[in-house]
Amino acid sequence: YNLETSQHAGKGHSPIRTQGQRFLTDFSCDGTVCFSYSAGNIRMDKHLALLRESNTVAISYTITNQGEEAGLSITPLMNFREHSASSAVSDLQFTCEPNTVGGFTLIPAAAPGLCIELSCSAGRLFPRENQYDVDMQYQTEVDNETAGLDTHFCPYDLRFTLPAHSSTEISLLCTVHPVQDTPVLSRPQADTAAIEIAHVQEYYDSLKQQAGYGDDAFANTLVVA
């Protein structure tokens, strides 16, 4: 099963959607983002958030395998560009090597003083033959009829074993920092990302509570304003 949920430019006005769209059972975006999938005997939640006061994203995977032993492959898509800009293969040139915290480290040719560091709680790295995901298309551009195609660098797959009739939790952290500070991440525990994401969700929930989010009086005030 391919649980990638994205779309790429096709011929004419018809985008090519990946197989993951078929297995997506739920999606939420409420301060943090969560994708839920069901495929065969596998159930998976992918939960992610930008950490507060830190140039770091946390991704938590919770996978339930209700069948025989299975394998899982995660392909991190990496990019380095200005916000709202697009990128091509020629823009994504990196020095890339495995690191000591379960992931890999990238130094962009466009900014050699910076380092992109990925850490993972488990799994093994496997180099990919095809290292670029080309012409990814975002729905915002489709809706606005603009040609915002993007490309990502994907040098490695992370592979995991899912024991039969088991539940597995995986944490990924990715951050950007000056090269001289390398490394800044430690290898996370299986639940590290979930804990960090919960802190972010608590923060957004507190903002809503303070603002009276969901209160008719608050909504009326916004309308008047």
Model-predicted regions and their roles:
Residues 41-43, 52-58, 67-69:
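Coil-to-beta-strand transition motifs
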Residues 56, 66-225:
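Acidic/polar, glycine-enriched structural segments that form the non-catalytic walls/loops
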Residues 48, 62-63, 174:
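Hydrophobic beta-strand positions in extracellular immunoglobulin-like domains
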Residues 1, 38, 62-64:
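A generic structural motif
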Residues 1-33, 114-128, 180, 199-206:
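An extended acidic
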Residues 6-52, 131, 135-149:
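Extended, loop-rich substrate-binding clefts of extracytoplasmic carbohydrate-active enzymes
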